[in-house]
Each structure stands twice: as C-alpha cells, then as structure tokens.
Swiss-Prot record:
Keywords from the UniProt entry: Carbohydrate metabolism, Isomerase, Magnesium, Metal-binding, Phosphoprotein
Family named by the database record: Belongs to the HAD-like hydrolase superfamily. CbbY/CbbZ/Gph/YieH family.
Record carries keyword Cell division: no
Example GO molecular function: metal ion binding
Highest rank taxon of the organism: Bacteria
One Pfam family from the record: Hydrolase
Subunit-structure text: Monomer.
Lineage: Bacteria, Bacillati, Actinomycetota, Actinomycetes, Mycobacteriales
Entry protein name: Beta-phosphoglucomutase
Enzyme Commission number(s): 5.4.2.6
Residues at which Mg(2+) binds: D29, D31, D215
Catalytic site: D29, D31
C-alpha cells in the first residue's frame, strides 16, 4: 500500500482500500485512471493538431512544429474540455482563431471545429482499437463497491457514457459528470473544482468525505482546489518527473496503478 505523507490523516479505515476513515465516496477520472483510453486521446489530439498546423504552415509560411504527444498533451490538453484544450495549446503557439459554435464541422477553422475534428478521430480510434480497462482499476472498483462507498466518474470527455457502457464499468458507477454534463449545466472544467464538487453533491457527500483519483495535472489541481479528503495521482508513465508534477499540482499520494492501494 502506498505511504501517506500527510501526518494528520485519521486512522485508515481499511487496508483493502488504503483510504482515510472519513472517505465515503470515490470520484474517478476516466481516461488514464480507469481506462487505457488516454493513449487514444493522445493519438487523436496529435493527428488533429499536426494536420491543422501543417495546413496552416503551408498557407502562411510559418514553420511547422508538430504537437508533442508527451509535453504538449500533459501541459495543454490532458483532462480539459475539448474547447479548453484547443485554446490552451493554440495559445502556446500564439495562434488565435474564432471560437465558432459547438456544431461547427471538423473542417471549420474554429476552436469548436478543431475540437470536433479531434472527436471524430477519437471515435474512429475507439471503433478500431476499443477501450481497455486497467486490471488494477477494475479490481479497485470491485473493492470500493464491496466496501459500500459511492462511486462517480468525473471526466471532461463527452464520450464517457459510451466508454463506460462498452467496457462494462457502468455497473460500478452511481453518478457521472462528463463533457455533456459540463455543457448542459454550464459547469467549469478542470482545473476548476466544479465538476468534482458536482459529483460529490450528486452522491450526497461533502468534499471532505470524498477521494479524488486523477492522472492529469489539471485534475489533481481541481481536487486540491475543491478541498477533498485526499487526492490520489496516477502516474502511468512511471517517470519521477511526472510524479513530482502531480504532487506539485496537488496530489497527496502518487501511484502507478490503483492496485497499489489494495
């Protein structure tokens, strides 16, 4: 089990879950935490941005600098709503385009258009490759469910419902706050804590009785900003630098797999 480095936590309620006694609900991000779809998102973001940047370079004469699937993904788009990810990355390249509207086609040179182009690419990857569940995450969900804790999935992806259904994870989940929810209820995306706060509200618990599980820097920052009982950072890369970044952004503990908490 992972070592907690905060000395003032109450007695751990169960060696099975590795959580403080006061925790009554678990709020999980989806991509990279429960499912191995983060790699598909990375591929889709890179394919979309590289195509757009190449088109733009040919049109304007600017130098083509491709999207970095490691540095750019984690810094600018991971864990954010699609439109926020598009704005964040383009801003890093000093590129400004109109927002457009949510129903813009993928060919439109707008924030929403590029976001929809990325989503189309993601759907193709999901059809071709499918979404895989991390074995350790499935085992942890089973243990959380057996312990009687509430479970919510909190994701910026608008595809969350479909992924949960196709992977069978929906049987563990009582509440879902995703990209569709954020749009319909006008909830701010991560790193704002609003989506996690909404999930806790739906489960009927206060933030100090809920644990947040995140692999994205924006996600752990959201968990810390919401004053949740504990924020668990998942470092699938295994790199010390990424673990340090997760802690710096608000993770109380960092693991490479949820099974380490069992």
């Amino acid at each position: 089990m992972a070592n907690w480095y905060r000395p003032n936590y109450p007695e751990v309620r169960s060696r099975v879950l590795g959580l403080p006694e006061k925790v009554r609900a678990c709020l999980f991000d989806l991509d990279g935490v429960l499912t191995d779809t983060a790699s598909l998102h990375t591929k889709a973001w890179k394919a979309m941005f590289d195509a757009y940047l190449a088109e733009r370079a040919e049109r304007t004469g600017e130098k083509f600098v491709p999207f970095d699937p490691a540095a750019d993904y984690h810094t600018y788009v991971d864990g954010k709503k699609r439109e926020d990810g598009v704005r964040s990355f383009l801003s890093s390249r000093a590129i400004e385009i109109p927002d457009g509207s949510p129903d813009d086609p993928g060919a439109a040179e707008t924030v929403y258009g590029l976001g929809n182009r990325k989503n189309d690419m993601l759907h193709k990857l999901l059809r071709d490759d499918g979404a895989q569940v991390f074995d350790g995450s499935r085992r942890y969900l089973e243990a959380v469910t057996a312990a009687g804790l509430g479970v919510a999935v909190v994701s910026s992806s608008a595809n969350t419902r479909d992924v949960l259904a196709t992977t069978g994870l929906d049987r563990f989940v009582q509440q879902r706050v995703d990209g569709v929810t954020l749009r319909e209820e006008h909830i701010a995306g991560k790193p704002a804590p609003d989506s996690f706060l909404r999930a806790a509200e739906l489960l009927g618990v206060t933030p100090d009785a809920a644990a947040v599980f995140e692999d994205a820097l924006s996600g752990v920052a959201a968990g810390r900003a919401g004053n949740f009982a504990v924020v668990v950072g998942i470092n699938r890369t295994g790199r010390a630098a990424q673990a340090a970044q997760l802690r710096r952004h608000g993770a109380d503990v960092v693991v490479t797999d949820l099974a380490e908490l069992l």
